[in-house]
């Protein structure tokens, strides 16, 4: 709950800064942070390799919220790319050594699936696309 309050407080500050209409060093820092985050994403798998599969959903959610707050549409292709590529991601191997993949963001852990569901809800709200 404290994390939720912290996020909402941060979001209010960001919205206030953006609505002031004058250049803000905070907005510049947001942009720099987003660009750095995007540079860590693996273009082959669609996920942020240093974060792993389910935490990539959290990074994607942050990316989507960044776009919603700033109006930066440059990240919209990233959302689509993650949707196409991360939906079939190797999450491990079974006891026989056979690779295990998630399919359509479903794996053996409900919480992992929940993080992806939250990301796709945010993507749908931002883009208006029902596929997410």
Feature roles, as predicted:
Residues 7-12:
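Sec-dependent signal peptide hydrophobic core
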Residues 57, 107-120, 132:
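Mobile, glycine-rich extracellular loop/lid and propeptide segments
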Residues 4-5, 111:
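Residue-level micro-sites within transmembrane alpha helices that shape
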Residues 13-18, 40, 120:
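Generic marker of "main functional regions" within proteins
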Residues 20-103, 126, 130-131:
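Low-complexity, Ser/Thr/Pro/Gly-enriched N-terminal "stalk/linker" regions
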Residues 1-4, 15-24:
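Bacterial Sec-dependent signal peptides at the C-terminal "C-region" and cleavage site
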Residues 101, 118-123:
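Hydrophobic/aromatic-rich effector regions of fungal transcription factors
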